[in-house]
Amino acid sequence: MSTTSVRKLSVIDSAFLFAETTECPMHVGSMTIVKLPEGYTGDFFEDLLKLFSERIHLAKSLKYKLAPAPFDIDRPSWVEDEDFDVVRHVMRATVPAPADRDTLQRLCGWMHAKPLNRARPLWEAYVFDGLPNNEAAIYTKMHHALIDGGAGAALTELLYDVSPNPPPRPVETAHAAGAVKRQEVRDIASSMMAAYAELWRMPLTRGTDMKAFELPRTGGSDLASVIVDAAIHNIEWPLRVAANMPEILQSLGSALTNALKPDALEALASLQAPSTVLNVQISSERSFAGVSLSMARVKALAAKSGGKVNDVVLALSSGVLRRYLLEIDALPNRTLTSFVPISAREAGNVELKNQVFGMVVPLATDLADPKARMESILAQANRSKELVNPFRPLVPHLAEVPTFGTPMIFQLLSTFMGRSQMADVIPPAINVVVSNIFFSKRPFYIAGAELTHVYPMSIVVHGQALNITVHGYRDELDFGLMAAGNVVPHVECIGDMLVDELVALEKAYGIAA
């Protein structure tokens, strides 16, 4: 019998799970700084714990834990944790003396290196009180198998408020909690026959609903149920692909047209990444730094250059990478390349599963002039968008491709990659990940405290020892720089260069700081 409390992980979600090793935990998070209300004398940790307890039903996926398939022969499922207790996930922590921002960053970096407990829902939150200037901090981490950047923003809307004194949120009733556990038993065979019949009755129009052929599952985690459910999925997936074939063919046709353009081969050749000191085997240690830049200054640069905020983020990242590699005498002659994630999430979609693809953009680190770098990045980013945009409609189909029997192989490959030191030998596919996620223009509050900064904390892996992720929040861009501790032990040095690089770009474009 299928239940609404069981959900199979997508291919993308499962990839994050099976790629995880001791050196490469696959969770993302944030270091959030909050300003406590004037005259506050309460216990912020207790207030936050109460808020999570009252609102956890608004984000039900936070109560799901993993149910692995027997022998890992198929993707695991999310099942509701019947023993869920919020106190196992929201905990108090203390920043040691001198309790400043640098100490907090080092502590969050150390905590980010620790993997999540797979026996429980894959998220944790730590509350740091006792910071100077009437501030507190919240470090959160959540497995990337559960969430992407777009879903993270949606989750924020549920847990955060737009005023310090919000109206009460809906409270979960016992009836509502019990209703999700009950579902009428359906005849699997007849449902499959009905789906086949529906396929031939349905006109094959662009954008057919992916759920039109959603067949029931047994929902069991025993070997027999997993095999049956995998067989059902192997029938369901081709039905969905067939129903969406016009859109798929249109996407492939657009991609082929772009690939046949005269400059396409030149564009692909420019995406080859050089080997650098950042593209090596990593340890489990992490180094983290958060830096804030003025959104107004970045937008002024975007307007002056004819680009967007994301283009300026790439130019700033390019500049600090060039500065850092020059400082350690390790700048390659060829330009570094960046992988830029792109959300495939439709507007209003708040599902927590990953819906993302991406593009590769050369960063022009071989150019000394900041303006020339910016212009090159603008041209390369536009070219890369043109190449990858036709693939956006394919993401939902690829995320559900049948994978029976492959998870175990994927895990073995991940283990081999770590133990063989292959990242020190093979050329990197890309040099760095640079991600820019819009967070919110309006201020957010949590348990009455105002969020002042939300510094993202992402993932580094073998061969990719540095990650730059940015949140646009209110009137600032909050940069989160995550690095492997054995490669960049003091990533705050790179963070400090961001301000200098912003000034250099402003000077190059004749903008007064």
List where the protein language model places each region.
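Soluble acyl-CoA-dependent acyltransferase catalytic core bearing the H(X)4D motif
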Residues: 1-12, 31-44, 49-464, 468-499, ...
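Short secondary-structure boundary/capping segments within folded domains
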Residues: 19-24, 422-425
